[in-house]
Every structure is written in structure tokens, then in C-alpha cells.
Amino acid sequence: MRTGCEPTRFGNEAKTIIHGDALAELKKIPAESVDLIFADPPYNIGKNFDGLIEAWKEDLFIDWLFEVIAECHRVLKKQGSMYIMNSTENMPFIDLQCRKLFTIKSRIVWSYDSSGVQAKKHYGSMYEPILMMVKDAKNYTFNGDAILVEAKTGSQRALIDYRKNPPQPYNHQKVPGNVWDFPRVRYLMDEYENHPTQKPEALLKRIILASSNPGDIVLDPFAGSFTTGAVAIASGRKFIGIEINSEYIKMGLRRLDVASHYSAEELAKVKKRKTGNLSKRSRLSEVDPDLITK
């Protein structure tokens, strides 16, 4: 959506950081070259991303987002998977569009705590939706054994499975369901970065371990705080991250340990409180009038 950034590439084949526009840079990636995509595009709700305000006409935003999704489908390998997050308001439109291109395998709910002020005239949002989808419903990567969690049986004693001969202790581990409980990243956490929509490392780790293998290429076209990249590299994957904001590019260079022209001081981590949301009136006064929803 935002243009005017001269693209710059950092890194190598194992970890690539691209400072540029997501859609423009996606179009440069070869077809069927990526194993896993995690996309967390703007929600168009007026977030302030280090001075860049997201507030566009709804029809323009949706058209742009659909074009991004189409490009993601093009670059994804036939056995690849894509995860996409967005707001509860936008996800129904995204869901319908993605059905035309992919097979949707899971509709995931990221359920989190919310200590902030909640809505007073409707039910406040306590989750964000995630779609997991694949190109080939019969042939895609899913490593269930890599993401097992403890099953909640409600019993205080070890259960015995008498269906087996001889009887054996009941297996308390299972593949997670589609409601994921991960706390949001807070200021006092070690993983905290100065980004208003930072996602937890644990959430990305589950996605990457489940839907890719060591050596696979993971793409994040809206890299943001580069959590996807940090987790991908730590998990033995290759990574391509696209980001338009220069301050967030610096985060990625530091977190992925990629060489650049920036000094150590410029890349140093300085913790600040999250950038606050703007009110509708405030954000509409700070963006291009041609993009404002009338």
C-alpha cells in the first residue's frame, strides 16, 4: 500500500532482508520458490507504525490485500502452506478470497489476555484469527509430532489405556487444537521490541515447526519486528523478510545478525513503550486525504 521506498537487500541466501514495498517485492520472487508463508498484513485500523499511519479507503485496502494474497499463492511451492492473520472485521473477506486459491485446512483462534480498556457497547475482542491454507490438500508439510502439547484429561492420576495389550500409560500428548493460548508480548518480556503489533515467538515457533522442515524457505512479506525471521533461523530454516519501515529493518538486521552499513549504535535495542493507536479523528488528519474512508 505504501510506495516510494527504494528497495535495498541485505543478507544472503540463508537470510534475506528486503527494505521495500511488500507487493512490489513479492512480484520479484520466482514462482513456486517458497515453502512457507506467514503474512500479518496491516489491519487498516489506524495503527501508528513509527510515524507511518495505516488508514486507507476500505475498497482500496481490500483490493490491495487480495493482490498480495494472489502473489503469495504464486510464489508458494505446490506442497507449501500459508498462514495469514488479520482483524476479525477483515477476515471474512480474506477467507472468501483465499478459498478461490487455496484449500483452507484450519481456522485458528489466537486467544490472548487483554488488560486494556474493553468495549462498553459491544463485546471486546480477545482474539485474532489466523487462516492456515495449502495449495495441495493431499500433499503438504505438517509435522504434528514437532508441536505436541499436554492433553488436559482432568485427572490427577496417571490414566491407563486398556485397549492395548499389555495395558500402557495413556499418551497425554496431542497435536494442538485450533484455539491457541499465547500471551501477547509485554514490555517487560525479553523478546519485546518497539513494534505496535509484535507477535509472540511461541506462536511463530508452532507455525514454523509444524509447516516447514529444516532448510526450507520461510517468507514473511510484512516482517515488522522480524520475529518470524528470528524463529525461522533459530529453527534451521532459511528466511526472506520484506519490510518498508527503516526502523523495523534495523530490528531485523540486529535480530538476524545480518551485516549492513548501520553502526552498532544505530542497531542497538532501545526499549520504549508501544506506539499507541490513534483515534479515528486523529489518524484521518494525518494521512493522505485521498486514502481516507469517507
Curated annotation (Swiss-Prot):
Keywords from the UniProt entry: DNA-binding, Methyltransferase, S-adenosyl-L-methionine, Transferase
GO biological process terms, semicolon-separated: methylation
GO molecular function, one term: N-methyltransferase activity
Domain of life: Bacteria
UniProt feature, compositional bias: Basic and acidic residues: 283-294
EC number in record: 2.1.1.72
Catalytic reactions on record: a 2'-deoxyadenosine in DNA + S-adenosyl-L-methionine = an N(6)-methyl-2'-deoxyadenosine in DNA + S-adenosyl-L-homocysteine + H(+)
Annotated knockout phenotype: Mutants are viable and show no significant growth deficiency and no alteration of cell morphology.
Entry-linked NCBIfam families: PRK11524.1
Similarity comment text for this entry: Belongs to the N(4)/N(6)-methyltransferase family.
Name of the molecule in the record: DNA adenine methyltransferase YhdJ
Gene expressing this chain: yhdJ
